[in-house]
């Protein structure tokens, strides 16, 4: 695939990618994020049909975004699409241990290839044109390259809702590091968040030198006013419950934050050694 080549110096290539990307995209693409909404449903053995509450939430987003292109990406649709456009990524996708890893990885691939907005199926839309609604008035004519919102602990970049311009080097970097990050971290929850989830993406964010391309939506604006969670967390396991209980205790919360910082440092070293794939 043309956008990814082997044996690249990461730091040099990020800067080169930004220069090329900024010079090649047209004026309209520079100003606006594509109005394309992506959602992903990958079924498991026990839950082949989408939960009703997810379908209701998805319908709310579709109805409020009739001027957006919309795709619900299923496992079969993803595999067919990857076979045509990203055949080199298909083995990476299939080699994940858990469906949630596949979902997280595909968020980055789809936002890189198409641009637009990704939103989890457990989020109900409450506003039209979410891309514009997430931005202050002075940023709506010339939209930022990437829209994110950060986790409360400052050690993760939430991946439940994200928006980006097409072929952006930030998501190129994310996709290029997924293979190297696909490791077992001894706990189910840690494996999810560190190999492809929010903590993985925060590691990519830390590596990316052009911080001015990001806009961070305040959680106080996002939740309750623009979107509403209808009850997700279907991927959570028993260790997630245990970790959550620890995090409610201040002493354990500090310990867990410290442990995650150490793990992040290890991840950064792994990703630093890895080359683009």
Q: Where do the model's predicted regions map?
A:
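Glycosyltransferase-associated regions of secretory-pathway enzymes
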Residues: 1-103, 121-277
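Small-residue hinge/turn detector
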Residues: 104-116
């Amino acid at each position: 695939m043309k956008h990814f080549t082997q044996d690249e110096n990461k730091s040099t290539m990020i800067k080169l990618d930004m220069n090329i990307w900024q010079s090649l995209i047209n004026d309209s693409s520079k100003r606006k994020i594509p109005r394309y909404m992506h959602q992903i449903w990958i079924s498991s053995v026990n839950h082949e049909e989408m939960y009703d509450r997810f379908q209701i939430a998805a319908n709310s987003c579709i109805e409020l975004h009739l001027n957006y292109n919309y795709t619900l990406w299923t496992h079969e649709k993803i595999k067919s699409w990857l076979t045509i456009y990203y055949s080199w990524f298909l083995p990476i996708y299939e080699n994940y241990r858990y469906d949630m890893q596949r979902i997280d990885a595909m968020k980055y691939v789809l936002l890189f290839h198409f641009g637009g907005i990704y939103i989890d199926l457990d989020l109900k839309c409450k506003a039209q044109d979410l891309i514009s609604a997430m931005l202050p008035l002075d940023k709506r004519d010339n939209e930022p390259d990437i829209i994110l919102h950060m986790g409360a602990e400052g050690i993760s970049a939430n991946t439940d809702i994200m928006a980006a311009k097409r072929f952006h080097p930030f998501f190129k970097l994310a996709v290029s590091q997924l293979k190297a990050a696909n490791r077992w971290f001894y706990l189910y929850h840690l494996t999810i968040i560190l190999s492809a989830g929010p903590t993985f993406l925060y590691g990519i964010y830390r590596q990316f030198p052009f911080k001015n391309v990001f806009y961070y939506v305040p959680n106080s604006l996002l939740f309750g006013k623009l979107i509403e969670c209808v009850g997700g967390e279907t991927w959570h396991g028993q260790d997630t419950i245990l970790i959550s209980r620890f995090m409610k205790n201040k002493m354990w919360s500090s310990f867990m934050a410290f442990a995650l910082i150490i793990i992040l440092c290890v991840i950064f070293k792994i990703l630093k050694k890895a080359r683009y794939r």
